[in-house]
Structures are given as C-alpha cells and as structure tokens.
Amino acid sequence: MLALWVLAVALVAYFLCLSIYRLFLHPLANIPGPKLCALTGWYEVFWDIVVGGQFTFKIEEWHKTYGPVMRIGPNEVHFNDPDFYNELYTTTAAYQKPAEWRYRFGFGSALFDTVDHEHHAKRRAPLAAFFSRSKILEFSPFIQEQTDLLVQRIQEYEGQVICANEAFDALTMDIIGYYAFGLSYRSIDYPKFQAPCNHVTEDVARMVHTGAHFPWVFTILRSIPQAIVSLLAPPMKKIFKFNEEIAAQIRRILKNRVNLDQEKNFHRTIFHEILNSKLDPSELTQERLQMEAGSLVGAALETSKMTTALAIYYILAQPDVEKKLREELRTAMPDPGKILSVPELEQLPYLAACIREALRLAIGVSQRIRRYNPHAPTQYKNYTIPPNTVFGMCHWEQLRDARVWDRPYEFLPERWLANNGNPLALNGQPLAKYFVPFHRGPRGCLGKEMGMAQLNIGLATLFRRVDHLELFETDQSAVDIVADYFVPLCVKGSKGVRVLVK
C-alpha cells in the first residue's frame, strides 16, 4: 500500500515539474498560445480524434487571439503570416519531417512519409522524372481518351442524376492506375461510376489522426487476419484487394527486371522507374514498392475528386460563370469533337481562372505542413525558434487569408483576370505569390502536372460536349470543408455534387 502512495506522489511530482518546465522554463515559453497546447499534445488528440478533424480550425481561431506566431504543442510552433510562407518553405531548405508522423497513413517507407531530407531527395528523384511535365504531356492523349469515355458515359445518363465526385474518382483511378502501375481498372464502366475505389480514400483518411498519434494501431491491424479486419472495417476489404493486385503486378515486374532496359513496347510504371534507379537494393523490395503505390493512389484520388467536383459545383451554381466558360470553350473549339492539347487549354484565360479558383478553395492538403530544422534556429521577426522545434503553416489559411484575398470564401474566377492577367493581392503583392495549392519547396506535390492536365482536359471536355447540366438537390454543403484529415473532407454522409444530365 505504501508503495502505491509513493508511486502516486512521484507521478504527481513528475507531472507538476513537467508542467512548470513547459509553461515557464521551456525555450518556447515566450511564444504566445493556449496553455493547454503548451502543456500537452493530448489537446490536439482531443480535437482531431475525439471531436474529429478540428484542430486545424482551432489553430485558425486561436491565431485571431494570439497573433501570427503561436505555440500549438509542447515543442511545436505555428505561423500565420502569408508573407512568411515562401521564406519558410524555400526550395533549398533541408528540413526534416517529424518522425512521429511517419506512420499516419500506414505507409512508413513510402516517399511521402520519408523523414530525412536527403533520403527523401533520393527517393523522389526517379518519381520526379516520371511525373515531369514532359512525361505527362506525352501521356496526355491517354488522359483525353479516358475523359472522352467518361463524358460519353455521362451523356448516356441523359435525364438521370450522377455524382460528379464518383465520376471523377473513377476517372482518376483509371488514369493513375494505368500510368503509374500499368493496370486497367475500368472504373468508369461501373453503373453510374460507383466503382470499388469510391470513398476508399475518405475512409482511410478518417484514420489518419489515429495513425499519427497511435502508430501501433496499424501494427495491430497488420497482425490480424485480413478476413477479420474486413468484417470489423468493411472499407478495408477494397484496400486489401487493391494491395493484392499491386503485389501481383510488382511480382511480374520483379521477375522480368533483368530486361528492363530493353523493354520498348511495354508501358513503363513507377515500379520500373524505381527499380532502374540508383537507389540502394534495400529500397527495391516488394513491400516498399507496395507502400509507394498505396501512398500515390491515396494522394491522387481524394484531391483530384474534390477539386474537380468543387469546380463543377461552383460553375453550375453561378450561371454567369458557366456562360462565360462555355462561350470561351465554344470559341476556342468550334468542333466539340476536337479538344485542344493541354498547353493550348492552359492559354484559355477563363478556364485557367476557374481551375485556379477550384484549386484555391479545394486546398489539396488541409493539415499544417510540419517540419523542423535540426541544425539551426528559425527566425521570425523578434522570435527565435530553437533547432529541433517543429514548425508549420496551413494551406487552409494561406489560400483564404483575408489580408490577401478579396472575398476569400467566394468562387471568383474574375480575380485572376484583373490587371491584364497579373492580379494583385489586397496588400499590393502579386497574387501568384500566395497561390500554393501544390505546396512549395523540395517536398512540393509530385503530381502537380498530372493534376493540372486532368483538370484542364476534364473540365474542358465536360463543358464543351455536355450542353445541359444542372445541380440536383445539391447546395454548398457538398463542397464546404468541415474537417481536416490531412486532406479536407466535407460533411460526413454527404451525397456529393449531384448533377442532372439534361
């Protein structure tokens, strides 16, 4: 009994001393912010797991009270200064990712979750070449071909309602599945595009905070037979099937890798690029290749679907916007059967403006981009942030900051056409300086060119060939972001952007 009392007193004394240190003696004690955040990381757990994906929104709220620099964890600082973004995320910055977030998606050895800067650069090199602009433009006829099939299928549903989210989710899966893995999923062939890939990334995303704070959860899941996991969590059944298909493809490629350099007619995948790279043999295992594939699909599906569906919603919800876009497309492409190339589509000012607004409001990544500098302090005005302190900024705030954007929560393509196509922010700086939907720096979005090609071809083809589309029982709640699970999510249970094909 005495031993228990001694243990209890010792624990109380420990936590009391720890609290005093974190509040008053810690190197970040001079940084303003909520005291609970300074005391413990469990406050973040409460908002992101118990409440559900709300810590990002609390950060935005707290900045209004505490100012542009704020302590949001025992060893983490957050900035909300649009002019500091490019200074913080420079292309030459050799920042590290916090190791404790490595397993938030369960892809611990994939490029995206690579912690070390130099290790990340080595892993990124073969994939960067694979997703370069020249490679994507070379592949763009296939993107157009698949989009043609999608739009043809949409036209077949005349008089019926389809979900834009599901349609473009299916399209993205077919495009990325073939380009990256050499697999044909034929997702757009499913009735009303309700393919197996639908909603999978959202279901996985809702586990991201659990994986970040409690990485052992994924370890336990891997130790349980797949049949049992599928019963407990039905969405996992689709993921297991995807993993099996990817594993089989990797085994085929590994079996024939001796002749990789001689393969001329076979479609080269990310697996070929990685296997033909200068990476260490330990990087070329089937397990790591599978994790790379899962990470890539997760990154592509949710962001592409969200951005395209959001664009369709706002274009249809604003008749003047739809009219201007259709007029521009008709003028540029008198024959709807002949869609311009990606470089030509990029020169259409109103289409480009609609795409930029969709990217701005869809955000891409809603969670803060966390980094730390192990070698040197980070300076922000009069604040010196010590080495090894985690810091970050949110795209959510950067892309909707009222100090930069006029009417930031509205879809206004015209903002991009002002000043002869060189629009200025409210502070007088070029607006492009603050437009960061793909992030910046050495860890910027790998799939930017693929995403832009899909958006240009997808929206141009849809609105040039399908003359009458109308929102059906859909309001702004279908695209309003209400939760952050690394990617932005709309209200749970939403039916998405539903469109009547007339």
Swiss-Prot record:
Stored Pfam families: p450
Biological source species: Eupenicillium brefeldianum
Keywords: Glycoprotein, Heme, Iron, Membrane, Metal-binding, Monooxygenase, Oxidoreductase, Transmembrane, Transmembrane helix
Function recorded in the entry: Cytochrome P450 monooxygenase; part of the gene cluster that mediates the biosynthesis of brefeldin A (BFA), a protein transport inhibitor that shows antiviral, antifungal, and antitumor properties. The proposed biosynthesis of BFA involves formation of an acyclic polyketide chain that is differentially tailored throughout the backbone.
Alphabetized InterPro entries for the sequence: Cyt_P450 (IPR001128), Cyt_P450_CS (IPR017972), Cyt_P450_E_grp-I (IPR002401), Cyt_P450_sf (IPR036396), Cytochrome_P450_monoxygenase (IPR050121)
Membrane topology, from the record: Single-pass membrane protein
PROSITE patterns found in the cross-reference section: CYTOCHROME_P450
Transmembrane segments: 3-25
UniProt-listed CDD domains: CYP58-like (cd11062)
Positions annotated as glycosylated: N382
Broad class of the protein's primary localization: membrane
Record's protein name: Cytochrome P450 monooxygenase orf6
Gene Ontology MF terms: heme binding; iron ion binding; monooxygenase activity; oxidoreductase activity, acting on paired donors, with incorporation or reduction of molecular oxygen
Keyword Transmembrane: yes
Cofactor or coenzyme needed: heme
Protein location: Membrane
Enzyme Commission no: 1.-.-.-
Pathway: Mycotoxin biosynthesis
Keyword hit for Lipid biosynthesis: no
Binding residue positions for heme: C445
Family to which the UniProt record says this protein belongs: Belongs to the cytochrome P450 family.
GO biological process, one term: mycotoxin biosynthetic process
Induction: Coexpressed with the other cluster genes on brefeldin A production optimized medium.
GO cellular component: membrane
